[in-house]
C-alpha cells in the first residue's frame, strides 16, 4: 500500500482514520465471534440432549415393535400397514439464533380412532403408537437443530475470515503505511529545517560582510 499512496498530511489523516475504524471493526468482529461461538455451544448442548433423548425413545420403540410383531399375525400387520393411523399437521416456524433466522418444522399427531384395532393387536402396539407420537416431533426438532448448527457454523466461519483479514492483513498494512508516511513527512520536515538553517546562515554571513 505504501507505494500507492501520496505521502502528505491529508493522506496520513485519512490513513489514521481508516486505521481507527479498522481497529474498532476488528474488536466488534471478535466480540461477535466470541458470542456466536458461545451460542453455538449452547445450541449444540440442546442438540446433544435431544439426540440422547431420541436414542432412548428409539430403543423403547424398537423393543415395542418387536413385541408387537410377536403378538400379531402377518395378516394383521399387513392390514395395519395400509391404514392411516395418524392425522398429521405440520407448521413451519422460524427461530432467531444470534440474528440468524433458522427454520423449524413442528408437527402435531392426532391418532385416528379405529375401535377394533386393539382386539387384533394388543397393548404393545398401542404403547408403540404412543412412543411414536412423542418420537416424531423430537426427530423433526433434532433435524432443525442440526440445520441451525450448520447455518451457525457457516456464519461463524465467515465472521472468522473477516476478523482474520482485518487482524492479519488490513491492520498491519495500515500500520506499515502510516509508519512509512510519517517517516517520509518527518524526513521532509528535517530536510526543510536544514535548508532553512542554511539559508539563514548564508543571510547572516552576507549581512556580516556588508
From Swiss-Prot:
This is V-type ATP synthase subunit D. The keyword Transport applies. Pfam families: ATP-synt_D. GO terms for biological process: proton motive force-driven plasma membrane ATP synthesis. It comes from Coprothermobacter proteolyticus (strain ATCC 35245 / DSM 5265 / OCM 4 / BT). The lineage of its organism: Bacteria, Pseudomonadati, Coprothermobacterota, Coprothermobacteria, Coprothermobacterales. It comes from the Bacteria. Keywords: ATP synthesis, Hydrogen ion transport, Ion transport, Transport. InterPro entries: V_ATPase_D (IPR002699). GO terms for molecular function: ATP binding; proton-transporting ATP synthase activity, rotational mechanism; proton-transporting ATPase activity, rotational mechanism. Belongs to the V-ATPase D subunit family. The gene is atpD. Produces ATP from ADP in the presence of a proton gradient across the membrane. PANTHER family: V-TYPE ATP SYNTHASE SUBUNIT D.
